[in-house]
Amino acid sequence: MAANLRNNAFLSSLMFLLLIGSSYAITSSEMSTICDKTLNPSFCLKFLNTKFASPNLQALAKTTLDSTQARATQTLKKLQSIIDGGVDPRSKLAYRSCVDEYESAIGNLEEAFEHLASGDGMGMNMKVSAALDGADTCLDDVKRLRSVDSSVVNNSKTIKNLCGIALVISNMLPRN
């Protein structure tokens, strides 16, 4: 009898947790709403649909920040490789500026994680916005070059798109 009561209590608790968890899940309609607010809705929908199965908003923010930081780190390594490989002085100056921007962007993304963890959507928003500015500044710097590494341009555009998604999500999070 006691075992039966424990099973019932366990099942009741499990059902309660499932109901609570599902009430915070992001629906495909909400994903569309998020993506409609970005500068590149088609990129956003493709990204969210391939990465997520109805996460909650904080999980969605974390995974988006994870992807953004991974891409920024990859871009930073590529930039350092280009500089180390030898380029003309003008290109070296532009790529060096990009390295500085990406070092700063990665730092801003690390702080965005901290704000997310503490439930501070506004703080996350400010740090993601700063990271987006870094990618944008790098794009401006390299567009002036005669010969540009396409992976730097493509990665910077992807980072801008990912930051756009994170910014929309941050606006949906609580403000501290």
Curated annotation (Swiss-Prot):
Keywords annotated in UniProt: Apoplast, Disulfide bond, Glycoprotein, Secreted, Signal
Keyword Secreted set for record: yes
Domain of life, source organism: Eukaryota
Glycosites: N154
Disulfide-linked positions: C35-C44, C98-C138
Keyword Signal: yes
Entry note about domains: The N-terminal alpha-hairpin extension is required for pectinmethylesterase inhibitor activity.
Family designation: Belongs to the PMEI family.
Protein name in the entry: Pectinesterase inhibitor 1
Gene: PMEI1
